[in-house]
Amino acid sequence: MIDKNLTKENYRYNHYYLSYSRFSKFLECEAAAFSDYQTEASIAFLVGSYVDAYFSGEAEQFEQDHPEMFNSRTGELKKDFSRANDIIHRIAQDSTLMHFMSGEKQVIMSGEICGVPFKIKMDSYLKDEAIVDLKIMKDFGKVWSDAYRAYINFVEAYDYDIELAIFQEIVRQNTGKTLPCYLVCATKETPPDIGLFEIPQEKLDKALEAVKNNLPRYLQIRQGKVAPHRCEKCAYCRATKKARLISYEYAGMSGDELREEGIECNDEKVKPEEYSDNK
C-alpha cells in the first residue's frame, strides 16, 4: 500500500514502519538498533548522500542543510565533496547508467513482512521494469566480514541483497509484480570506476528468507520479551560498556564470540512498543 501519511518530510522519523536501514542496524548490533544513541554522519556517508541528492534533484537543498561541505574561508567545496562531483559527472556520462537512473525518484511504498510494517524509498523506480538503488563505495573489491570471518563480495558484506529483497517484496505487494533489482554503483577512486550489477532472483529469495528468519527475534526484543544482544564492537557498545573482570584471552572478542564462551553481554530489555503509538 501507499500510505499518504508517509511522506518524504516525515519518512525518516516515522517509526511505525521498520525501514531497511533500521533493520540493517539490528543485524549489526541489536542493542544499538534499540537505543537512542546517535553518531555523527561520517564524511563517507555524506558524500554518498550528496550523490543521491543530486540524482533526485535535491542537491541545492542538501547543500543548504550541510554547510560543512564547504570551506569556511573560500566557500569552495571541500576535497571529498569535490570528488563527489567527479562521481556524479562520471555516472552522468554513461547512457546505460542514466537509463537506469531515469525512473521516478525517491518513491515511497509500505507493506508488511511477517506482520511487521515496512517502509521503502527507492532511488529510481522504473515502473513495471526495475527497482534501482544507487551506491557509492571505496572500490569494488571484497570486504572483510566479521560474521563470515572472511573477505566476501561487497553486495553481501553491506547487505545490499537484503535491502533490495525488502524493496522487491514491498513493490510486489503494491503492484502484483516481481521486478528485477539492479545496483548502479560508482567508486571513490580517481578516476571513479562505475558498474551496473543485477542481483539474481535466487539471491533475493534467499535474502528475503533471512529477513523473515530474523523478524521474530526483532519483534521479541521490540515487545520487551528478550534483551537485545550487544555486539561489543560498535560505537554504541564502546560508549556504554561497563568494565568487568574477565580473562585477558577474551579481550577484543565480539559479543557473539563472548556468548559462545558463556559470557553474557546483553542490554536491558526494552520497553514494549505498540505500533499504533508511533503512527
Please identify what each model-predicted range represents:
Residues D65, G141-S145, T178-C185:
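Short acidic alpha-helical/loop segments enriched in Asp/Glu that coordinate divalent cations
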Residues F55-A59, I136-D139, R172-T175, L219:
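Hydrophobic/aromatic-lined pockets within catalytic cores
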Residues Q38-E40, S72-E76, S145-Y158, P200-E202:
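Short histidine-centered catalytic/ligand-binding loop motif
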Residues M1-K121, E232-A235, A251:
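Metal-dependent nuclease catalytic cores that hydrolyze phosphodiester bonds in DNA/RNA
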Residues L97-M101, L126-D133, V171-L179:
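Secondary-structure boundary elements
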Residues F154-D161, I166-K279:
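Metal-dependent nuclease catalytic regions and adjoining charged, substrate-binding loops involved
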